[in-house]
Swiss-Prot record:
<dbReference type="InterPro" id="IPR006286">
    <property type="entry name" value="C56_PfpI-like"/>
</dbReference>
<comment type="similarity">
    <text>Belongs to the peptidase C56 family.</text>
</comment>
<dbReference type="Pfam" id="PF01965">
    <property type="entry name" value="DJ-1_PfpI"/>
</dbReference>
<dbReference type="InterPro" id="IPR029062">
    <property type="entry name" value="Class_I_gatase-like"/>
</dbReference>
<dbReference type="InterPro" id="IPR050325">
    <property type="entry name" value="Prot/Nucl_acid_deglycase"/>
</dbReference>
<protein>
    <recommendedName>
        <fullName>Uncharacterized protein MJ0967</fullName>
    </recommendedName>
</protein>
<dbReference type="GO" id="GO:0005737">
    <property type="term" value="C:cytoplasm"/>
</dbReference>
<dbReference type="InterPro" id="IPR002818">
    <property type="entry name" value="DJ-1/PfpI"/>
</dbReference>
Length: 205
């Protein structure tokens, strides 16, 4: 009987510790913000809205920015109004940067020196850096993929950009290498969001 009582008390203590740790994690994440970057035109809709839903449902705040303020239009016709640009961003305000893909990424994001600079800052501050579809090319051009496993939308030009930057290209849906997360296409948008969330939680333990 005594033995059973000891076991029950031990289980209760372990359960209490797990609940406390879970509450602490939620508390740590409560004021955390994720920066999502989109092209002003032709961003890929699912790659914005599906990860955003994952982040917000887990208590994270999300700021969406672009290269210009105002209405941004996705490839599928969804619209979102952004009130800040990448030029207004302070990396210290965020736990992660997520660069959304779509065909607009090549035109508006690949060569954007400010965005490339932001990626470097997030990476050097040990924050989570992530990109999906065509946008891992931005990470490649920022020089943070050298020696890292990564994926990208399977367009020859995009794959070549990663290899040229020294990345270990993998033809997989989502690739995680430390704080760097890349995804291949909108088919993996939700899984990508979940992996970014995991990395944020790990970084904020």
């Amino acid at each position: 009987m005594k033995r059973l009582a000891v076991i029950l008390i031990t289980l209760a203590l372990v359960s209490s510790m797990c609940i406390t740790n879970s509450n602490e994690k939620r508390e740590n994440m409560k004021n955390a913000k994720v920066l999502m970057v989109i092209a002003p035109k032709d961003f890929r809709d699912e790659e914005l809205f599906e990860p955003m839903a994952v982040f917000e449902s887990n208590g994270l705040k999300v700021d969406v920015v672009s290269t210009t303020k105002g209405e941004c239009v996705g490839m599928l016709g969804n619209k979102i109004t952004v009130e800040k640009t990448i030029y207004d961003v302070n990396p210290d305000d965020y736990v992660a940067i997520v660069i959304v893909g779509g065909i607009g990424s090549k035109e508006y994001l690949w060569n954007n020196t400010k965005l490339i600079e932001l990626v470097k800052e997030f990476y050097n501050k040990n924050k989570v850096v992530s990109a999906i579809c065509l946008s891992p090319v931005v990470l490649a051009r920022a020089g943070i993929l050298k020696g890292k496993k990564a994926t990208v939308y399977p367009a020859p030009e995009a794959i070549e950009e990663l290899k040229k930057a020294g990345a270990i290209y993998e033809d997989r849906g989502v690739v995680v290498d430390g704080n760097v997360i890349t995804a291949k296409s909108p088919d993996y948008a939700r899984l990508f969001g979940l992996e970014v969330l995991k990395a944020i939680e790990k970084n904020n333990e």
